[in-house]
Amino acid sequence: MTRRYWNINLEEMMEAGVHFGHGTRKWNPRMAPYISAKRKGIHIINLTRTARFLSEACDLVFDAASRGKHFLIVGTKNKAADLIASAARKARCHYVNKKWLGGMSTNWSTTETRLQKFRDLRAEQKTGRFNHLPKRDAAMFKRQLSHLQTYLGGIKYMTGLPDIVIIVDQQEEYTALRECVTLGIPTICLIDTNSDPDLADISIPANDDAIASIRLILNKLVFAICEGRSSYIRNR
């Protein structure tokens, strides 16, 4: 895999607060190699390590996108939900930003059934079929559609398991990460100082609570994916 330059700037990361970890009492000792200092009761993340692993992640997603691979971005924190959705749409990735339903990947046949139900209901709504049903039935189908849109809206075009999964906040998305590990799906994971850096294929040490930090990391990955997709289109 060729290494490329992704304009990852340490000063820019500091301005976004990427270096702020959790309180020193909440740390995972395995994160010690990624921590540079303690300040006012919190751990400070070593941004040179962040830059290194973010660059590796950008190389990986560029290479995968240039070969037409598919991505899934997972981040279900309320304050980051809109950011996850917009980043995924920009890079034409699938996403989960509300709740990871247990077995979403390991029990893919059930997920496929739910997705087909979702597509059928969307088609019926578009054709106006709901308008010809009794009010009670129409209301029931609309509730089902709303529920499916909330939890499956970001993966409605998925036809199979993703090739790479990008996870924002290891602690919050532990179930999703474990499912990916079980299936052997490569993972890129934002990890704060309370995380285990050994679980994902590429772990990017970063503040996973601040929106500015999450946005910066995602923007770099999205740019790399978009560049890879452009390369794929040119070389087809």
From Swiss-Prot:
Signal sequence interval, chain numbering: none
Q: Which domain of life is it from?
A: Eukaryota
Any one of the GO BP annotations: translation
The answer to keyword Chloroplast applying to this record is yes
Compartments annotated for it: namely: Plastid, Chloroplast
One molecular function GO term is: structural constituent of ribosome
Disulfide partners: none
Swiss-Prot/TrEMBL keywords: Chloroplast, Plastid, Ribonucleoprotein, Ribosomal protein
- Main subcellular localization, coarse class? plastid
The keyword Plastid is assigned to this record: yes
Q: Which family does it belong to?
A: Belongs to the universal ribosomal protein uS2 family.
Protein name stated in the entry = Small ribosomal subunit protein uS2c
Native organism is Ceratophyllum demersum
Q: Which gene encodes it?
A: rps2
